[in-house]
Regions:
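Non-catalytic structural scaffold of enzyme domains
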Residues: 1-202
């Protein structure tokens, strides 16, 4: 079975410092371990880029993180200019910056998505405020000639319909969701962690 933990009490993580994010992530892991989880997907870019190394060092359970998909965007970009829309916590993280440095020949236009997560959580996906924010965040990327937009927050795929209305059709949108699902299935199979009918665990 799958256990889904949403830390709504402490969300959003994007504006928190690394120490807070690590502490909250460990608290969440401790809760999930009490539910007999055999593998944990850290389904948050900010938590992954700030805390997953600490989690892997402290716990024996396998962790799968979700990171901004810079690699496929940079490798496939024809203009060698890509955009990334993410939280402040993700863009400031050491893990993100190490990844970005690997693609120094590609210009990466970074934009913090201030206010987006809260609007999504409040259900304001099509509000004038949301559309205004997206326009202000994406317009400089379009002007810089990006051909890929990386969504660096697990909330942002909810905004793909709105984003597509703003971006020219040739700009491709990438998020990490499908890759994380494939990696999760791979690890479950390799470690034989998939449960049978009636088995406990998540």
């Amino acid at each position: 079975k799958t256990i889904y933990l949403a830390d709504s009490k402490n969300a959003p993580y994007g504006q928190k410092n690394k120490e807070e994010i690590v502490a909250l992530s460990k608290k969440n892991v401790d809760f999930l371990l009490k539910q007999n989880c055999k593998l944990i997907v850290v389904a948050c870019n900010t938590a992954t880029t700030n805390a997953i190394l600490e989690l892997r060092a402290e716990y024996e359970i396998p962790f799968i993180g979700i990171e901004p998909a810079i690699k496929p965007a940079a490798n496939n970009s024809k203009t060698q200019v890509i955009g990334i829309l993410a939280t402040k916590g993700t863009l400031n993280s050491e893990l993100f910056n190490k990844t970005a440095e690997m693609f120094h020949e590609t210009k990466i236009i970074e934009q913090v998505g201030y206010g987006l997560v809260q609007l999504i959580e409040d259900g304001n996906l099509n509000s004038p405020e949301m559309n205004q924010l997206l326009e202000s965040y994406l317009r400089p990327m379009i002007d810089a000639n990006i051909d890929y937009l990386v969504l660096g927050c697990s909330h942002y795929p909810y905004l793909i319909p709105q984003i597509k209305k703003i971006l020219p059709k040739h700009i491709q949108i990438i998020d990490s969701g499908e890759a994380v699902a494939r990696q999760t299935q791979k690890v479950l199979n390799e470690k034989r962690l998939s449960t049978g009918v009636g088995d406990e665990g998540g």
